[in-house]
């Protein structure tokens, strides 16, 4: 599916097809349609109730606009009178329902398009009711929109009104043709372009429409192409569904394609556009930055008004929830000093929080299964704290598959973005991973009991939470060794810390414990050591490290025992000073096999890499602060960060610096991206533990580890 991406897979718009069908052939002789196949499409696609529109979702805005346009087209050519009458009957019966429709779901340009169609219908003596309260509201909105972008402006610079020219009177076409897109369209709108062709007979308009009518067998979409939109949103959906690892080459090509079309002013849904929007720009910025491309945050200055508000399009009449949602998500990848993203984060978060408080999370661009759930998760769990399996588990309940429908000039479908195949595969993949995690959890419990770790202060609740954090962060079945090494390392660190602290061991006793470990022999612990209780815990540590080392030796032919032991010796000798993150990182990198390229790098080689040492220092620093924050939270009982997700200014600043170190790349850099990602993975797990209260964590554990996706 991803390999076949071109200009975009998208459903047909009866409204736009009707405008194309209205175009007359100027070849001379008798009056005839320029595109007869469009009339054939209209006659073949009337719904049973007499309307035209999306068959899967009933929106009165969509049905009225599509139906009136198709009736106008058929009446204009005096064909299929029975279909025309059936369409008129539908409108007479349902026009009053415009009053009941939620205005947030009004199609793009509806307030301009419908009045224009009604004027044409009156000239054709089509009898439809026009004195409803809802229609009067539509006419009022039309005046507001036209006043926001005065006629002189729309003839001078590209604006979104180029997308909705159809039916507008008094246009100066000699000026508008200078604003035509490279492909011959007017802002990629078939209906607007069809109207322009009627008025100008421009060859570029004719070529654009001819190409797409041929491609779509007589019909046309509400907008085309949608190449950037499709490339970006398909990748976003696959990532959030937890499926991106299966499509890495295709995803990398998608992102590279978007990068080739990127401009300093941003992008819109299609390449080579003279108009940009914040929604596509924010999604593009976020995914490009995540994949290591250099993109400047200054792009968002083009979407900020003098009053400090962010907008999607200049002259917009309403603000889209999803536009602000994607701006908020993009802002969370800010680097140090990117003040424009600080402003964007504040503005978008405030907008979304107000919408949520008013129970008003409806969007003007999409009707989706659970937009309030998506927005709520983003607000409640900031990206730094969002563990991969947690995000995926929630998104599996929010993603609507085939049922999600987009709102353009009409309702439309994007099958490469929203489809049940993605959903079914994601559910199967998640449940398979979860089953493996549950089996691993059973084995962890057996290991815990056989080692008597409870006697040293490790509780079963802490055991579960520790394994859960590892499994939610490194979830892939093929990474079982890394996941179990993370979990057991974290469990043993907590057990030893508990033993040292709560048993109130003297300095000499702690030194004896460390010395015994440093001079270990696996045979030594067969029948216990000199101090049975202490030796039991040392023996567990020794046996665990030997087991982990043996796994890697058998799987990859590498002996990691000594560097793994060295990492533990360093932690034991400085455990009071922190160092948990460093031990987890060294363990994860030793177990991971060198990253995606699976080219193993020794500890010595990694330590000599300047980028590795930068990452290590940054991660240790921020994780130590997060652990300190978490302990103060537990001890002080206040344990909440404020509503914007801020712990301290210092922590947020250091997280931004770490993100920059991880996601930026240079041509000379030889540090594998997967190794780099390990640093951010560990830091985000620490942030999660510091950010979320215990009740939230318990809820996540139950949902992620034990609640099967149905």
Swiss-Prot record:
Q: Which reaction does it catalyse?
A: (2E,6E,10E)-geranylgeranyl diphosphate = ent-copalyl diphosphate
Residues reported in the UniProt entry to bind Mg(2+): 277, 279
Record-listed E.C. numbers: 5.5.1.13
Which BP terms in the Gene Ontology apply to this protein? gibberellin biosynthetic process; miltiradiene biosynthetic process; terpenoid biosynthetic process
- Entry-linked InterPro entries: Isoprenoid_synthase_dom_sf (IPR008949), Terpene_cyclase_plant_C1 (IPR044814), Terpene_synth_N (IPR001906), Terpene_synth_N_sf (IPR036965), Terpene_synthase-like (IPR050148), Terpenoid_cyclase/PrenylTrfase (IPR008930)
Domain comment from the record reads as follows: The Asp-Xaa-Asp-Asp (DXDD) motif is important for the catalytic activity, presumably through binding to Mg(2+).
Role of this protein: Involved in the biosynthesis of ent-kaurene diterpenoids natural products such as oridonin, miltiradiene, eriocalyxin B and nezukol, known to exhibit antitumor, anti-inflammatory and antibacterial activities, and in the production of gibberellins phytohormones. Catalyzes the conversion of (2E,6E,10E)-geranylgeranyl diphosphate (GGPP) to ent-copalyl diphosphate (ent-CPP).
Tell me what this protein is called.
Ent-copalyl diphosphate synthase 1
Source organism per entry reads: Isodon eriocalyx
Q: Which gene encodes it?
A: CPS1
